[in-house]
Amino acid sequence: LVENSSDLDFGRRFCNILEQVHRQTGKCCVVLVDEYDKPLLDVMDSGLRMKDGNGNEVLIEDHNRGILKGFYSAFKAADAHLRFVLLTGVTKFSQVSVFSGFNQPKDISMDDNYEAICGISKAELLENLMQPVGELAEIYDVDTDKMVELLEEQYDGYHFSSGMTDMFNPFSLLNAFDKRRLDSFWFSTGTPTYLIRLLQHNHENLNDLTGRYYRPADFVDYKADAENPLAMIYQSGYLTIKGFNRRFNTFLLDFPNKEVKEGFVSLVANNYLQVSRDTAVEAMEWVQTIEAGNLSLLRKQLTAFFASIPYTMRRKENERERERYFHYTFYLIFRLMSTYTILTEKRQSEGRADCIIETPAAVFIFEFKLDGTADEALRQIEEKGYARPYAADKRPVRKIGVVFSSQTGTIEEWKEA
C-alpha cells in the first residue's frame, strides 16, 4: 500500500494506509485501539533508559511518548478517511501531549450516555444469563436469588458515572459461569507492573484513599504520577464510584466488590509486609478462628504472622516510622479480614475503636497499643464506651486489649475482659 515505507515515520505510514484503504474500497475506516497507553504504563517511573537514533541516552518513557504522539497525530491528518475512532486505555495522559495532534477527541469516561457500554448490568444478567446462574446455584446448593446475590457481591459494583448504573465485571462473571465456581478471575490475570511500582511509592497513604469523596479532577484529569496514586488506581479498575453528591459534584470512591477488595488489599499487604505466605489465606484462617471464638488461637496466629515479617520491616529506626508501621500493619490485617466477615466502624462521640468484628455468635472489640499495656487498652474501651451500641444486643461482647512492641515488632501482651 505504501511505497518506501521504511522512510516514513509511524504516523505518516499509518495515515497512508488509511488513505489507501479509503481509495481502494470507497469506504471510510473504523479504527479501534485497545490499551493505547500500554507503551507508557509499562515504563512509567521506571527510570529505564535507551539510546535514540542519534546515540543520545533518553528515558524510554519519553521515547515511547514521542512515538505515540506521532502515531496518533495521523488521525487528524487522515480525518477525511475516518468514519469512527475509539481508543481505550487506563489513563488520559492529559498533560503529556500524546493527543496534541488529535482533532477534538470526545472523552466518554464519565458520560452518563455511555456508562453501561462496558460490562454486564443486572438487568442483562437476569434477562439473558439465568441458565448458567441456575447451574451455579445448583452446585452451591442455593436458590437462584441467592446465587445472584453472591455474584453481585463478588463481581458487581462498578459505576462509571453519576447515573450509578451497577455493572458486573464481564471477564470474571463469564469465567465463573465457564469454570462453574466463584473465584478471583480478573485479579489472577496478573497485576500490572506499573501498579506494583506505584504501590512501592505509596504504602502508608492507601488507607486514606478509600471511602472518601473526591472532585472529578482528582481522579479523571491528571498527570500520571507515582506521587498521586488515586487516579491510576481508580482508572485501573481497583476503585470505582460508590456514591455521588450532586450539590458539591463529588464522587465517593471505594472498592467495587469482594474480588477486587480481597485481591488489592492482599497485593498491598504482601508487597508492604514482604511475607512469604499469601496474606489473604492467612486472613481466612483468622476469620474462622474468630468465628469459633478461639481468641487464644488467634493470638498465636497473629504472633506467628508478625514473626514471619522480615526483621528489617518490623524494626523501624525512628518513632514516627514505628507508629506508622504499627497502624498500617493492623489496618491491612483487618481490612483483609473484613472481606470475609463484618468489620464495623461505629464512631462514638469520644472516638472510635480500633477494630470491632461481628459474628453471628459474638461481638469482638479490639484496642491496640504501641508499647503500652493491655490494661490501658481495656480501660480505653470502657472509658470511651465502645461497647455501648451493643447494650441491647443478645450476643456476648468480648473486649480484647493488645500491645504491640516497637522493639521486637510483634505482639507483646494480650488480655481479654
Features from the language model and the residues they span:
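Metal-dependent nuclease catalytic cores in nucleic-acid-processing enzymes
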Residues: 70-78, 231-239, 328-336, 380-400
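Mg2+/Mn2+-dependent nuclease catalytic core
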Residues: 53-66, 370-387
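Active-site metal-binding core of divalent-cation-utilizing nuclease and nuclease-like domains
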Residues: 20-25, 336-360
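Switch/connector loops and helix/strand junctions flanking conserved nucleotide-binding motifs
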Residues: 39-41, 94-100, 374-377, 407-413
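Conserved catalytic cores of phosphodiester-cleaving nucleases, focusing on short active-site segments
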Residues: 330, 353-370, 384
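Structural motif
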Residues: 30, 362-364, 398
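Domain-level recognition of nuclease-like catalytic cores that cleave nucleotide substrates
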Residues: 389, 393-417
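Phosphate-binding site recognition
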Residues: 1-322, 337-338
